[in-house]
């Protein structure tokens, strides 16, 4: 049988083209099925190990040692960061001699490390000391600090050509006017501010990609339903996440992001709750323009599966 299949694949006969295509498809399908059978449930490097029956973390306290360990795999930051940086470099043309990057909410330091490895001067800042400690241990050669981004004196005036605020970090700032003022102060003229913004009425929760989600892609995509909650299973714990939107979103702009982790052995539970301040995109851009920023570019993040999410690139003109 294998000799017959090999003869089809290696044949130069044009009449065998269709057979070659069908055999190739069959091999791909078999490979997908094999991966599905072997690799589920999804594995995260560090397991869930919690001695207390119940732990509740809110806002800045969410990012402790546990979250630092699982953050990159849980939110798939590697592929997203790689794609985002490719867009930023394509649209702003930085150079390794003169460009200086600042990553706001630098988390585990992955973005800072990628830029540094590509020859750029780059600094990171995060409010979580646990995240900074994790980043320093993982990437000893990067420059990253724990500081308050709301403090205008955190960095000197006109220090950066690029300020990145990705991973929906901007929604953690209640006073966005202050945020934009600080960024404007820290940037040089003709510098760029990169924001990850979402259509708050249409965006989906970022879902961890499990291997069992691999499937044939139809030629005509069905209309997608909005996903604001997920239930997912990992090697050591069950994971649930959801966004809670108020009825009067236009008036309050306050959205809650909740996560729950349940140990599969002990049934111990950890709950995270984060308060997000989600003005609509137009209002956020208008606040930036009032400070002095101008629009430079916009990139749709649908290419990486994040529908109704965008990278906005703003410029400080002078």
Regions found by a protein language model. Give the residues of each.
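SAM-dependent methyltransferase
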Residues: 197-285
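Class I SAM-dependent methyltransferase SAM/SAH-binding core
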Residues: 109-152
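A short glycine-rich, Lys/Arg-flanked "PGG" loop and its adjoining helix->strand segment in the class I
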Residues: 177-189
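A short SAM/SAH-binding and catalytic strip from SAM-dependent methyltransferases
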Residues: 161-175
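Conserved class I S-adenosyl-L-methionine
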Residues: 21, 27, 32-96, 98-107, 110
